[in-house]
Every structure is written in C-alpha cells, then in structure tokens.
Amino acid sequence: PKTASPAKVSATKGYGANVVLEGSTYDESWAHAQKIASETNATIIHAFDDSHVIAGQGVIGLEIIEQLPNVDEIYVPIGGGGLVAGIITAVKEKNPHVKIIGVESSAYPAMKKSLENNTLETVRGDTTIADGISVKTPGKLTFDIVKQKIDKIVTVDDSDIINAMFLLMERSKAVVEPAGAVALAYILKHKPE
C-alpha cells in the first residue's frame, strides 16, 4: 500500500524488487497486484491465503512446541489469518490442549467479526500503527481453518501496541514493528487466563 513504511519499502528494494505502491490498504494493493500479474503473465502468491504460505508459517508453531513443550497458551497476531492458520494447525496437531489466542488491531477486527457472524466479513478499517495486520477481509482458506480451531480472538488499541513496543525497546533492546507487538500488547493489558 501507499502507506507501507519506508523501512519495508527500502528493504524490499534491497532484495532487487520493483516496488509499486498502490492502494491505501492491503486489499487494494492485492487487487492492483493481480492486475499487474494478469497484464505481465507473472506468477502471484497471496501473502496469507495460500496453503504453502500457511504451511510455511506453521513451522513457527512447531518451533514453539519444541522449545516450550509445556506451553499452555500462544498469542498470535492476525491480519489476513495466514500466520495464525499455520501456527494453529501445527500446534493443535501436536497438542490439541494448547490454547491459541489471536490478536487483531481494534482498527481492523476482520477475523473477529467474521467468526462472530460465521461468514467472511469486510471491515471498514481505520488508521492504525499496525500496518502489517491492517487487512479488511480475511482469507477464505485462513477463515475456514481459524473458525474450526481458534480458542479466542481479542483486539488491542494503538496505545497498547505503542506501550508494548516501548517496553521491548527499553527492556530487551529489541525494535519490533507494531504488528509484531500486538500479542505482547494484549498480555500486558490483560493477564493470561
């Protein structure tokens, strides 16, 4: 999207990519990317609603289970749902008792709304610091997986995300993008069950 962070754009260009900034949301950018792919006969891979992408992200769940075999809960950021779909599939296969809690930005609660209504929903969306998870409509494939396996979806506000980012900088000397801080943001504001 046109709102992509300069750091992400620069890093992507650094890999040799031709970056086209179009649309104000992921959904608008995806539509434009599909148009370019069609016009240029290019291969296009969806960022989250693709079985291979979901499987690849599932490896994170396997690593969590390997490193923390007694884990009770895992909090996962949700935008379009690919990350949570992959993690939940892998983790629930290994240990169905682990609770998976998805965390969305309160500005883009698309998966939460979709689950509440048992159908894919498109949210209007609002300004958020968490651009990496600002998705108006979850993926169909990801929605189908998440609705069968998720334990709960919660939301966090930008102020909570910023607090989590600052804590990570101060205590861990880690600089994370806002989408990567949403799980900690929720945990800091609400004690895990």
Language-model features: locations:
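PLP-dependent amino-acid enzyme catalytic core
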Residues: 1-193
